[in-house]
Amino acid sequence: MRSYRFSDYLHMSVSFSNDMDLFCGEDSGVFSGESTVDFSSSEVDSWPGDSIACFIEDERHFVPGHDYLSRFQTRSLDASAREDSVAWILKVQAYYNFQPLTAYLAVNYMDRFLYARRLPETSGWPMQLLAVACLSLAAKMEEILVPSLFDFQVAGVKYLFEAKTIKRMELLVLSVLDWRLRSVTPFDFISFFAYKIDPSGTFLGFFISHATEIILSNIKEASFLEYWPSSIAAAAILCVANELPSLSSVVNPHESPETWCDGLSKEKIVRCYRLMKAMAIENNRLNTPKVIAKLRVSVRASSTLTRPSDESSFSSSSPCKRRKLSGYSWVGDETSTSN
């Protein structure tokens, strides 16, 4: 039997008021302490290069310190726990159809927090609570419709947290991040970089969508923590360019990407590009048997007719069905739960 008390950890860490109305209707600029203008990736292509250079100059303030990756390599931080948390964030992002930026911001908040503050445990309930709080904050920054704190806890969570516990964790995250939530991300660069390769804009949609997929598919891998958002965006665009026969012959990642904007590092872009290519090969190797198995299941399923009146089948797959609570462990400020 393991006893969890959040009050000792959170009360010592948070010195804010208990007035939780702060999280109900504030403007997103309040969280960042900066301008409330929303710099979406779709607008980046129309900005001059010096504006993008300003993002490159500022991105260092929105990433963990340079030794963060080494903490996973030395196992002072649990890489598998981080990977599980990121995987859960991506599942919830897909479940609620959140923007890719929301998921990326949630992971960014989590990494910056873990760099600056040590959790009472490197895995288990502390990491899950942190992931829920970071995703909630990211959704409040970017989404129009935000689920309740209870409804965030879907997609295979092991513990259920009370709303007041999550809110206090949100305050702790805000405090540790100095309320700087308007982070610089790869999505601030990909449209601009795509135009550098394809000035006509013919393949712009293809570039943005596929680069976004590459970025999110690699976000679980701790090795990418070595690279800043601009390098990740440039490397992703180069990977996409090599998928297009009309562009792959003229795109050389070893020659041109650092000329797209002042402040880019050729060495980091090339290294990140190589890592993405290696990860793509590895993922294809691991996923091929699963894809074949799924295709076989689909073929078998398609040969079986399902009666329209089969209400039990419908109700079991309905996303609106009531969630069962018996498989979860409740965790609150003054309660204990066994692990």
From Swiss-Prot:
UniProt entry tagged with the keyword Cell division: yes
Tissue: Expressed in roots, leaves and flowers.
InterPro entries tied to this protein: Cyclin, Cyclin-like_dom, Cyclin-like_sf, Cyclin_C-dom, Cyclin_N, Cyclins_cyclin-box, Multihaem_cyt_sf
Keywords: Cell cycle, Cell division, Cyclin
SMART domains: CYCLIN, Cyclin_C
GO biological process, one term: cell division
Subunit-level organization: Interacts with CDKA-1 and KRP6/ICK4.
Homology family: Belongs to the cyclin family. Cyclin D subfamily.
Role noted for this protein: May activate cell cycle in the root apical meristem (RAM) and promote embryonic root (radicle) protrusion.
Name the UniProt record assigns to this protein: Cyclin-D1-1
Organism: Arabidopsis thaliana
Gene from which this protein is expressed: CYCD1-1
